[in-house]
Amino acid sequence: AAAAKNLTPVVLELGGKSPCIVDRGADIEVAARRTAWGKTLNAGQTCIAPDYLLIHRSLQDRFTETFARALQRLHGDDAQQSPHYVRLVNDRAFERVAGYLSQGRILIGGRTDAADRYIEPTLLGDVDPAWPVMQEEIFGPVLPMLPFDDTDEALAFVNAREKPLAFYWFGPEKTGNEALLRTSSGGACLNDVIMHIANDRLPFGGVGNSGMGRYHG
């Protein structure tokens, strides 16, 4: 009874690399639009931003084209002039995130302005999973894209890494529900990103190396 009076809830949120999977059967327009928004919200400086994209190999080209259009609709032809697109928080963050731009082939974006701490929304291809861009939390507007050939391969890739703070899936709902049962993450969305944190009736927190404890809900 004495201890109960002094119990204090604790939430330790540590972030991590949150995967976004785009599987066969996904609505590419929806996937590109929502991923573009979630990745460039606060210039990617959110703990639950999509940190890397796993996409079915057959969808890569179409997604890239659609993602470019989605970014243009969000931020215009020049994101640096957009009133809604923010800058990296400090010079150290700028240098760290800008360093990822050389770790893959730039498919979209890639422009920087150090004086303005500006990094254009960027999609990277031909990325090696062993490179720092795939080993460290990016916390910026750079999205590495890796192809997969079947769902089992994508889920094995996620499960071989530390448990993420968030897990995002675009594809048929049935397959997505199965993916949730086969992975572990702090939170998750099917055919959306970020939005699970907006509902104060849902618990939020991490698991494993992405944190412990829950709040809301």
Name the predicted role of every residue range.
Residues 1-128, 151, 190:
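ALDH superfamily catalytic-core signature
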Residues 21, 72, 118-217:
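Conserved C-terminal structural/oligomerization subdomain of aldehyde/semialdehyde dehydrogenase
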